[in-house]
Amino acid sequence: MNKFGAFLLLSMLACGFGAVSAQDAGNRGYKILQKVSLPGDGGFDFLTVDSDNRRIYITHNNSVQVIDADTLKLIGTVDNVPHPHGVVFLPDMGKGYATSGDPGSVIVFDLKTFKHLSEISASKDADVIIYDKASGHVVTFDGDSKNSTVIDPATDKVIQTVDLPGAPEVAVSDGKGYLYDNLESESKIIKIDAQTMKITKSWPLAPGASPSGLSMDLENNRLFSGCHNQLLVVMNAKNGKVVQTLPIGKSVDGTYFDPASATIFSSNGDGTLTVIHEDSPNKYTLVENVQTEEGAKTMAFDSKTGHVFLTTAQRGEAPTPTKEDPKPKRKIIPGTFHLLVLGK
């Protein structure tokens, strides 16, 4: 090896990547393509993309903001959604569902007019919401209440409320009759029968701790759990065995698996997007850590364009701690909320 080759290898190792294959290199080069300012100065949480119908749904400022995924223009707002968290959409039924953390309900809205259709009582801190095709149910995971609310979208009535053995975070459906959920307080993943809502398995994520974001490779039965101790844990969804762990940024809140490129993304509140390649179901390679912006911890992926969407806002200095509020949060600077578009 010549001196230049030795220097290049040492430089790559120092950056924490090691030798990068040609396939991995094809996943590199994500960058911020565009920043889109959006109105409102309140809090924000999850966002999701309807790639087929070209819509981005963003929970923000006691509402759901609806963005055209091509023009990136605000085209509508679902108003009066207090403390919004998650959104799921059912295009065939023409309606969407948004969780309202306080008082704890689900707002049903029309996908064309964005008007409220009904409000369904759930539990306090109604947070994550998903649709399971196998059972035909809409399911919420209610963090502080440590339970799950199951809704029949045909009637928009609650079928049952299920207690969980810990505070739930992000959940996914395998489309084959099972749900998987991160239990943040227990550092475990639970497997749930989607029809009966009975827990069939409970698996520790160690060495991962305090999991938040969760996504799944449906074909290869792999779960990707983003944990707050800066690890992405890859788990075999058949037997609960930890396949591999990889380093990610701080304050993760979202992960996504793109089957077309075999890429896992982890959106981190420290202002990074970790990109990982699935070389095989049992081998994963860290590709890059893309600089984003502080607070951009939730994400959505557009399967049509390959773009990653993140939301964030600038924050001021933290107020002086008091006895009543020993850890005051930094307040959002008015007029700074925006959507980040990342791609190659």
Tell me what each language-model feature is:
Residues 1-8:
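Bacterial N-terminal signal peptides that target proteins for export
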